[in-house]
Amino acid sequence: MAKPCETHWKATKQVLIYLKRTVNYGLLYTDVSDVQLAGYSDSDWSGNLDDRKSTSGYSFNIGSGVISWSSKKQPTVYLSSIEAKYKALTSATCEAIWLRRILEDVGTQQKQATRIQCDNQSQLSCHTIQSIMPYPNILSYITFCERKD
């Protein structure tokens, strides 16, 4: 920061106080017999009223513990809710591929497809997307399932 002021100093002190109070906090991951990666993805369509941009996010679990997550405002305005959902699923797919490779590197290869569940009112069926990414043979392991309501 080029010119820190009193507000920055107060914020820094608050962060340090928080860290001091929560130094003994942690996440508990229990031992699971089946290490199956599961993903969840969602996006709101034009959720920001100022610029009409969507926010999308995903999380990935092994057992009951979250191992990866993301939430971010999209850089462009999408024309439909289905476009926003598929862009979110594309990001989640990239993360799933990366996580599967990491799990394989540590000796925990995934034997089944990674399910990425998405709540989507405009599509009421399961899809396997082969054409979004340039490596369709990798995407054969990843199935998108949208919840039927």
Locate each region found by the language model:
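Divalent metal-binding acidic/histidine catalytic loops
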Residues: 1-149
